[in-house]
């Protein structure tokens, strides 16, 4: 049995995986919570994951015995194959996952960083209960369990892998094998009659190759939206492959000979110039200090196949994030203090208004009492002087 385990193919797979992470569809983010620098990926669901969301995927899907599963793989520790990359591309990455599993655009819970149980409910509602979709979840939406490899054994031994892949891989590669249509012309014709309406719609949309359209519909199980994604990804992939074939790649610099084999290329923050480099270079240009622009760079060692992260840049990124959180906390505290001050001013104004109203009421009462006391006195004075008003008379 022949295995695709040469260093040349692994280099291409790792490079394509790195480019896929930083593409516009994924933006180097976790497809669930949106955190930067994902370190895991669910291959069959087509979504990159951070460490927290990857552990939630294992917890939610690990104890199930039905058709729902998540094939979670590490980006640096597990071994990736061409089929894994093709499946991720065909599913559309984080954006494709959101379109298929969350068309209602339900946001990730804000309290997910504090309570992991909320994240579990979110993942369960999204993939198990299908609350974020308009249609029901089907078993074929999760793909085939034959693609779900054990991550630990996959890091060291590729012989346990199944060579049977989904038809989305065969379509993405551009090959149209007769076995993809059931192995006979009758099966091909039955699929064409079953998807006749979808084929007509694809043809009206400009996809004129009937064989490719039928292959895409068979891979998508009749879902026309996924079939369109397959067709678009296939076209863009062939264009990128042809463009890459026409451009030549510059050779890598030579490594110094070592007796103990290749070592991990970990950046320690120093600028070291080897003697081989100085002897082979006609002119030496003084290196300038690196300026941190806020983005975290990942480094790939082709000898070991491992991906490293500059610890100094990682610390600076974490420091910037902490400063932003502190500034946000200070702004919230200031806003709260201003709100309290305004509330106190309003309370004082209301108290003053009530006091003024009470004072006016007391003055009105005193004025009424004075008027009542003055009325009998004026009547008595008029009677003593003999000048009574018309209609009044003396009685004895």
Curated annotation (Swiss-Prot):
Which parts of the sequence are annotated with region: Disordered? 148-194, 233-266
**Superkingdom of the source species:** Eukaryota
Chain ranges of the Arf-GAP domain: 14-141
Bias-annotated ranges (Basic and acidic residues): 148-161
Positions carrying Phosphoserine: 153, 184, 187, 240
Taxonomic source organism: Saccharomyces cerevisiae (strain ATCC 204508 / S288c) (Baker's yeast)
Query: Would you tell me the protein name for this molecule?
Result: Protein GTS1
Any further remarks? Present with 937 molecules/cell in log phase SD medium.
Q: Where are the zinc fingers (C4-type)?
A: 30-53
Q: Which GO terms describe its biological process?
A: endocytosis; negative regulation of phosphatidylinositol biosynthetic process; positive regulation of transcription by RNA polymerase II; regulation of transcription by RNA polymerase II
Q: Which residues carry this modification: Phosphothreonine?
A: 249
One Pfam family this chain carries?
ArfGap
Keyword check for Heme, yes or no.
no
């Amino acid at each position: 049995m022949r295995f695709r385990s040469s260093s040349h193919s692994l280099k291409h797979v790792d490079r394509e995986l790195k480019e896929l992470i930083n593409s516009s569809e994924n933006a180097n983010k976790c497809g669930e919570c949106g955190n930067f620098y994902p370190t895991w990926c669910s291959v069959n669901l087509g979504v990159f994951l951070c460490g927290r969301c990857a552990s939630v995927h294992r917890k939610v899907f690990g104890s199930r015995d039905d058709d729902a599963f998540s094939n979670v793989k590490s980006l640096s520790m597990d071994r990736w194959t061409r089929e894994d990359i093709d499946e991720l591309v065909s599913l559309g990455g984080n954006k494709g996952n959101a379109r298929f599993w969350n068309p209602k655009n339900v946001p990730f819970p804000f309290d997910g960083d504090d309570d992991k149980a909320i994240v579990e409910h979110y993942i369960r509602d999204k993939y198990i209960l299908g609350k974020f979709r308009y249609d029901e979840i089907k078993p074929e939406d999760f793909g085939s369990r034959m693609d779900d490899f054990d991550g630990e054994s996959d890091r060291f031994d590729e012989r346990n892998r199944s060579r049977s892949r989904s038809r989305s891989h065969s379509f993405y590669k551009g090959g149209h094998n007769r076995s993809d249509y059931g192995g006979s012309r009758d099966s091909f014709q039955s699929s064409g009659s079953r998807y006749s309406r979808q084929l007509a719609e694809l043809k009206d949309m400009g996809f004129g190759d009937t064989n490719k359209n039928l292959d895409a519909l068979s891979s998508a199980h009749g879902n026309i939206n996924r079939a369109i994604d397959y067709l678009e990804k296939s076209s863009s992939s062939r264009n990128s492959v042809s463009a890459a074939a026409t451009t030549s790649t510059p050779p890598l610099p030579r490594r110094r000979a070592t007796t103990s084999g290749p070592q991990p290329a970990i950046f320690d923050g120093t600028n070291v110039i080897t003697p081989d480099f100085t002897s082979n270079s006609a002119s030496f240009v003084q290196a300038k200090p690196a300026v941190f622009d806020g983005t975290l760079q990942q480094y790939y060692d082709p000898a070991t196949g491992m991906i490293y992260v500059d610890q100094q840049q990682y610390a600076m990124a974490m420091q910037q994030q902490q400063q932003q959180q502190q500034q946000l906390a200070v702004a919230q505290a200031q806003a709260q203090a201003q709100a309290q001050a305004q509330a106190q001013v309003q309370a004082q104004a209301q108290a003053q208004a009530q006091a003024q109203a009470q004072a006016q009421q007391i003055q009105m009462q005193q004025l009424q009492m004075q008027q009542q006391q003055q009325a009998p006195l004026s009547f008595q004075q008029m009677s003593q002087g003999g000048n009574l008003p018309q209609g009044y008379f003396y009685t004895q």
